[in-house]
Amino acid sequence: VKKTLIPSLVIVLLVFGVLISGCAPTNKGGAGEKVVEMWVMPNSLNPITDIEELLKPFEAKTGIKVKITSVDWGAGWSKITTAATSGDVPDLGQLGSTWVSAITGMGALEEISQEAIAQMGGKAAFVPVSWQTTGTEGSGKTTAIPWFVDARGLFVRTDALKKAKVSVGELASWDSFKNSLKKLYDADLVLDGQPMAPLGVSGKNDWNVIHSLAPWIWMAGGDFLSADRKSCVIDSEESVKGLMFYLGLVKEGYVPSEYLELNTAQVSANFNSGACAMYFDGPYEIKTLTRPESEGGASTSPAAKNFTVTGYPKGPKGRITFVGGSSLAIFKQGKNKAAALEVIKYLASKQAQINYAKATGFLPARVEAFNDPFFAKDPNRKVFKDAVFYGRTYPSIPTWGLLEPILTRRLGIMWDYVLGGKEIDPAKIKDQLKLAKQEVETILSQK
């Protein structure tokens, strides 16, 4: 699942498709039966079946039937905007967290009342960073409820560390992380007959470009937009410093240059097969490594027998990771909005959150769900639990959907500088960031 899941989720973010789409709703049921049309993305190997199983207790108790439509990733943006403008919408839909503000700006989403939010425990019941994306920043209105969360950590081959005489604790800061990579490189690792590179990262062809680079920008003290959201600050010295550190790991040979042609799924497969000792990914990789091949997992892979997870190494401004995920929203022109709200309340409840996290490999958006032993007692999952509380997301503004592709393209060009020449020129990095700033501010000025 992981191989197609998160990559797909991030693809949607990058190609204007983190939303949902599908066929027209048909709110027809038996006599007196309430049918809620719900559009979702394939969040698991069996997306419709998994949600149908999750909803069985709800349907039995309420008599509300939920009709699930799983929507393809690529055409999401055009389909949802067409649906929103035509009125041919479902009652309820899954929205990628960074797109809630854009669809809210179109006037397509129903505001969720404070009374309903209070019935779900209030905003304090949800992971703070996920609540930041439940409406347009500064509007005071909520148009979506967090459903699940995605954060990232560092997956590590423990046997590789042992052979290179490196401890997990030595991966805790930028400097010690870099020194550890050198030790792994100098060890000239070969495990089970497989040569092993110290680190695996994806390059500009990946859907994760901005999500992979953002933590290093943030940890160096950089950012994308000013606090008032009126200007772009990506060209700061701090941003350059963060990018130079991360790109430098490849330039120094700790990442094979051919990895820069790979996407996240391919790097993940390399880690699982033993081709690299470390790489950054989300909690769904734990599900992959603990699930049998017959169910799409890799539980018999070399990595499955010898892995642990730790957080990002701390930078000058601390440890920060990117946090994404999805929310649930009701469409204004939906036919069963009251029933759709009841579905949201159920899916946002503690046990439903735990059950869906187990089915998908994602993280719950509800804070109390993390108290379940599945997260609290598993040291690897606990790393991701911690990450959602120190992580960040992007500004929840309607124009972010236009800004992200610009930033992705400009940041992707950085990898060309890694492949060309002997040294990475900070001036060239800054030039690209200045171009990004100009393009972003052109969009911001049109608000």
Feature names for model-found ranges:
Residues 56, 63, 116-117, 136-212, ...:
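Helix-loop-helix "hinge/cap" segment bordering the ligand-binding cleft or interdomain interface
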Residues 126-136, 304-311, 357-409, 413:
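Long, aromatic- and glycine/proline-rich binding clefts that accommodate carbohydrate-like moieties
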Residues 53-129, 162-165, 172, 269-270, ...:
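Extracytoplasmic "Venus flytrap"/periplasmic binding protein-like
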Residues 65-66, 162, 390-447:
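Conserved C-terminal helix/tail region of periplasmic/extracytoplasmic solute-binding proteins
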Residues 41, 53-54, 100-102, 211-215, ...:
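Extracytoplasmic/periplasmic substrate-binding proteins
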Residues 97-153, 192-197, 209-214, 219-221, ...:
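Hinge/lid segment of periplasmic solute-binding proteins
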Residues 110-126, 197-203, 220-241, 291-305, ...:
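Short, solvent-exposed loop/beta-turn-alpha elements that line the ligand-binding surface or hinge
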Residues 1-37, 60-61, 116, 434, ...:
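Short, low-complexity disordered leader/linker segments with a strong preference
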